Structure formats: structure tokens, C-alpha cells
Amino acid sequence: MALLLCFVLLCGVVDFARSLSITTPEEMIEKAKGETAYLPCKFTLSPEDQGPLDIEWLISPADNQKVDQVIILYSGDKIYDDYYPDLKGRVHFTSNDLKSGDASINVTNLQLSDIGTYQCKVKKAPGVANKKIHLVVLVKPSGARCYVDGSEEIGSDFKIKCEPKEGSLPLQYEWQKLSDSQKMPTSWLAEMTSSVISVKNASSEYSGTYSCTVRNRVGSDQCLLRLNVVPPSNKAGLIAGAIIGTLLALALIGLIIFCCRKKRREEKYEKEVHHDIREDVPPPKSRTSTARSYIGSNHSSLGSMSPSNMEGYSKTQYNQVPSEDFERTPQSPTLPPAKVAAPNLSRMGAIPVMIPAQSKDGSIV
């Protein structure tokens, strides 16, 4: 009885071993962004597996918020690869003959969104097998920059830093001195694997060229730093120069303002003078015409008077023209009425006329 039971169990083990199986073990694959990931899935068939061959790849996204999605399928001797939009056109079977036992795929141009668990399922009735692969996409360190944070002067404290523009954690750093003795200062040894080295009481011996290499599991990058520790600068001279420069700038600004204001005053004065000139006022007559009209009026008045009646008049200064003639419109001089004697009036043809007079009491005389 015991021998029969052992024979049955042995036959079951042999039959299980001969069924469909995937020979590639489960694993985790790490690749850099932009590279191609090879996901292996090799299988063997047993003589009992007589059904149609179906191969299916699925993805379980890393955020665990989405259900498993089919990314590529082989069924009925046809390939279907347009199930998952994020991987459309980037996932392919590596073998042209999947019946040979190779269901491996390539995922090209890897992105961070491709991180997740991929599952390979092979079916050939009555055999069924599956295997999982964990894919991790990392970003290579790139754009590393080395620089000094602080003043590179003797006796001062500053920091030298190494910073990559991008790169997946964890990151490792390594500092080296490339010039002179190529030996790092003793006080820096504890920080040679850090992104920042703190420099205390700097000396000229620290001057030189340094390199920083930053790396992770998928790549590395490097930057160089030229450190030049110099004596302290003359800050008093710099301050004095800054003050003098400021004063000169203020003086220049003041001069510009003064010139602008002066020009405005001149323009304003010219406008006022221009507005004071009236076009509707005729210009004053010349001195010659004024003097001639004055002399002519005197001659006409005096021509009808006898010499005896001219005693009360002073001789007019014809050579002097009043200054007021230049300031106002010339006017004919007003002369007192001439007194003519009765004999002269008779000779001139005058006719005597009797004019009644009125006495003080109102009677006419």
C-alpha cells in the first residue's frame, strides 16, 4: 500500500514538472530615464499543453490607485499593443516567434510614469503560468555645479558646494584636489563625501582646482571648481571710492537740474516779452515830422499878428523836441487866443458889431 502511494505521488510530481512554466525568476530592474528596459519572460511547454497560446503583459502602477492594465497581448497569432495609452508605441516583444518560448518585452524611452510592477502571463490550456518584475526608473545626475558661497579671503569662513540640477536619490558625492599636491586639506576629510564643505580660517594653501563627482545607481556627473584664496581687500578705499562716486553723481544731477531750470526761465521771459508787443498800435511818428508840424502851426498863428502883439510870447526852441513825442501820439500845441488891436482889425476888413450888455441889476445896456 505504501509503495502504491509513493508511486502516485511521484507521478504527480513528474506531471507537475512537465507542465507549462516560466523559467525566469522574479526580479527588480533599475534603469535610467530615457533608456530601454528589457523585461525577460521565458517559458517551457509540456506535451499536454495543446490549447492555443495566449501571452499577456499587465502593469500595476506604482501609485496603486489604478487597476492592472493590459499593455500588450498575443492571441490567435496576432499582437495587440494599443491598450495602454502611456506606453503606446514604446512596448514591443523581443522575439518574432513567440511559440519558441520567449515572451520577453522591451520598454523604450523610459519615463518616471513607467515605474511599477509588470506581470507576464502565459496560457496554453491546460497550462497557465505568470511572473512579476518590478521596474524602477531613476534619473541620472546631470547639470552638476560647483561654486563658492562666501568671500575667498585669507582668514575668512566660506563654503564650497556641489549641486546637481537633477538626479534621483540617494546621491553620493566625492571631492578631489587636482592641482599642486593633490591632497585635500586635513580639516576637510570628514566632509569629502558631502555636497557641502565648510572652510574655516582659510589660508592661501587651500587655493587650487577641485573636482566633485556626484553619482547614483544609474549614472554620474562631475563639475570643477577653481578656488583662489587672496589677501583681504582694502575696504576703506572701496568705501571712500563709493562715497566720492556718489557725491560726483549728486553734483552732476544738481548741475543738470540747474541748467534745466535756467533754460525754462529764459523761455518764459521770451514768451512774456513777445506777448507785450501789440500789433494794433501804430508806431510813433518820426521826430522830424513832429517838429515840422509844430513849427508850421506856430508860423500860421504868428503870421496874422503884428509885431506889437507878440511881446507876451517867448521864443519857441524849435531845435528841441519834447521827449514825450516818443512816448505818446503827437498833439498840436494849444496857444492862447491872439489879441489884435482895433486899427489892425479895420485894415483886415473887420466890421464893428454892437453886442448888448447886461447890467448887474439885469437890465440890458
Curated annotation (Swiss-Prot):
Gene3D superfamilies reported in the protein's UniProt record: Immunoglobulins (2.60.40.10)
GO biological process, one term: mitochondrion organization
A GO cellular-component term linked to this record: acrosomal vesicle
Residue intervals annotated with topology Extracellular: 20-237
Domain named Ig-like C2-type: residues: 20-134, 141-228
Lipid anchor positions (S-palmitoyl cysteine): 259-260
Subunit-level organization: Monomer. May form homodimer. Interacts with LNX, MAGI1, DLG4, PRKCABP, TJP1 and CTNNB1. Interacts with MPDZ; recruits MPDZ to intercellular contact sites. Interacts with JAML (homodimeric form). Secreted isoform 3, isoform 4 and isoform 5 can interact with the extracellular domain of the receptor.
Protein name from the UniProt record: Coxsackievirus and adenovirus receptor
Biological source species: Homo sapiens (Human)
GN (gene name): CXADR
